Amino acid sequence: VRRDASGQNQPNAAVIRAKLITAARPQLLEVEIISGKANRARLNRAPTRPTQLLGICRTVLFAPEDLTLVRSDPQVRRRFLDDLVVMMSPRLAGVRADHDKVLAQRSGLLRGLKRKSGSARASALATLDVWDEQLAQLAAQLIAARVKLVRQLRPWVAQSYQTVSLAQSQANLAYRASLLAARGVADPDIADTGAWEDYENSLLDVQATSKALLETMGQLRQRELERAVNLVGAHRDDLTLFLGHLPAKGFASHGEQWSLALALRLASFELMRADSALTSIDGKSEDPILILDDV
């Protein structure tokens, strides 16, 4: 850790290093975090993009703060899904980053349109059409990746919750898409596995989802202009956690919520371990690192 000394033009910074062996080869990973600047990364002492380090050292951390996965707002659960998606498929880091950039650009444009009129407003609306298309394409990819992950994670969460809690209630997950809600599609009953399978299947076709998002953005255009917010897309979706047939948020006890949050992290670990075994070379798989804080 480096702190800014009086009279010196050096920002606060910290360096994180990890030495590990992957595929029988030693690796040195370094990330330099600099206050007010972009992070820097090195792989085996050679400069690289931070995204290039993703997936090399797969790590799962459980901490008491993870109770927010059950209790808090949808953005916490979306971040959980997206972090795990990128850990499993590092190539999707670019899709996630591009999506967030386009979303921010579109948000800024919507806010700016409130102050525009005449030809300036017409020009801004034409630009909005361009951002709509880009956002729809990127959001569709992100949604499909999340749904695939939820399907992979679901049995591991159920198993991990049983192991942790020894309870009779079964843990379950459901991905809720703002796109389908905006198009009048009701959420199925959590007990109806066939209906949920159909619901999720409708989100796996990236081209179809992109087209549907673009159409829905057009239908919501006036409301978005009035409110200056993006009303539909991956950024409005949620992951609902169930114990039995009831959502854990609002119905589960503190102990049940704690066990479910831990089960989510343990399930992530088991999923990555299973994936490592499937993609191993010469049958030699490498387990991810599991860190449990205050369990």
Segment roles from a protein language model:
Residues 47-56, 63-137, 177:
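A conserved P-loop NTPase coupling/switch region
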Residues 1-68, 74-76, 80-92, 156-162, ...:
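Nucleotide-state sensing region of NTPase/ATPase domains
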Residues 4-7, 119-292:
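Conserved NTPase motor "head" modules and their coupling/switch loops across ABC/AAA+ ATPases, GTPases
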Residues 25-27, 50, 115, 182, ...:
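Intrinsically disordered, low-complexity acidic/polar segments
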